[in-house]
């Protein structure tokens, strides 16, 4: 691995003793506001959002190797985390401009890699929407943008975690059969691209290469992939990068995410952990709004704990150390 000693030490702070990244993701901003808005008539307040993040940090970070937060609402939570829990901070603005073509990336204007590091981050995380089949005039802008962030992180000697979310502007529903058919190529080709040294990415945070809801044996309706085909997509994903890579939970249920990790492992994917968000804590949102802080704490200590504990047990059996990657 051609990483500096400082970067290696930082990634070690984000992973457990086995070299597995069992990270809790709570950098949601727009998605969190939408979740909260389902359960209350008024606009979610800054205080509500900050407190919910603090509750999750206080109750669950003792079971996570690290937590991903945003510097907009997550700094009180970063202070509340367990002392042994590493910190990733998000560098991107939430969402994207729906009126502009291409889902172009945008940094938080008040932040830099230097400032995130000064804030105590062990790594910088940036989310990029990427479609390998988009027009080159769009993709060249994205590639240049990621090069800039990569260079910034090299200058500050801080690990760069790149999160890639795939899409297709011609297929509005990425949960559809139509998108499921093109997803494996889009996910794996994007991984291959951003593994190139010019981007200076240290760890990839990625989607699983299939929509598990259309895999034979998991599907309730139409089947897009046989088990063998799905397994091959996971093998291809593992071969697409020499970098450590971790899976995001993409808002699926805790149970489905755990089953997905088992499937990936059996297929031969040597993934190095997870950044799991909503699959762990989403149920606390409604409880917090409707019943208050104490009830939310109780949910986190019971159901939330079970979600993260079950996930950790699955990771122990399925994930491999990032130190085994080149």
Curated annotation (Swiss-Prot):
It is an enzyme of class 4 (lyase). It comes from the Bacteria. Its EC number is 4.1.2.40. Pathway: Carbohydrate metabolism; D-tagatose 6-phosphate degradation; D-glyceraldehyde 3-phosphate and glycerone phosphate from D-tagatose 6-phosphate: step 2/2. It catalyses: D-tagatofuranose 1,6-bisphosphate = D-glyceraldehyde 3-phosphate + dihydroxyacetone phosphate. SMART domains: DeoC (SM01133). Disulfide bonds: none annotated. One of its GO terms (molecular function) is 6-deoxy-6-sulfofructose-1-phosphate aldolase activity. Gene3D superfamilies: Aldolase class I. GO terms for biological process: 6-sulfoquinovose(1-) catabolic process; D-tagatose 6-phosphate catabolic process; lactose catabolic process via tagatose-6-phosphate. Keywords: Lactose metabolism, Lyase. PANTHER family: SULFOFRUCTOSEPHOSPHATE ALDOLASE. Belongs to the aldolase LacD family. This is Tagatose 1,6-diphosphate aldolase. It comes from Staphylococcus aureus (strain MSSA476).
